[in-house]
């Protein structure tokens, strides 16, 4: 049974993490990440919030990492488009960004410290929804953190797009809450992958033919 996720307090200048299940560091652990940004362009926009959660390979939550709000100057915040100003204003994130003293470098160091407790370097793919976008920002503003992940991504949006095309009725069964905060978006991504695993990716009984084929290609 999956361990439920509970909302950890957002951090502004120092990071803490909440361990929800006693478990060991493992090559098979999955690291989930989400960022909120001022826009879509790493060249012009900046990171304003980042959160991290670790699960095992069965999507059971092992640890909830720091939720970090990153300070950005007013000129960066004033440059946001109407959608971002409205979304991050309603969530209260803009006010938190203005009050925060955490820099991108401090956030990167805190996240790396947390990550190293749960997975070795280059073992976990970066997990999330449309995670390539987060990775672009991370490569620019938190390159040491980006380099700690495996080069592969585990992108739930891939299954979303396949499900919409192959099993549209199943795709309609998962309704996103669209909260647009880093931690809430991670929770939703994990829940979404659990949903696809249960309803879209079916466990098929192993046939003798399949077992023979697997044995023939095994190293």
UniProtKB/Swiss-Prot annotation:
Location in the cell: Cytoplasm
Any Pfam family hit: RNase_T
Ranges of residues in domain Exonuclease: 30-193
The EC number(s) this enzyme carries: 3.1.15.-
Signal among keywords: no
This protein's GO CC annotations: cytoplasm
Function: 3'-to-5' exoribonuclease specific for small oligoribonucleotides.
The protein's name in its UniProt record: Oligoribonuclease
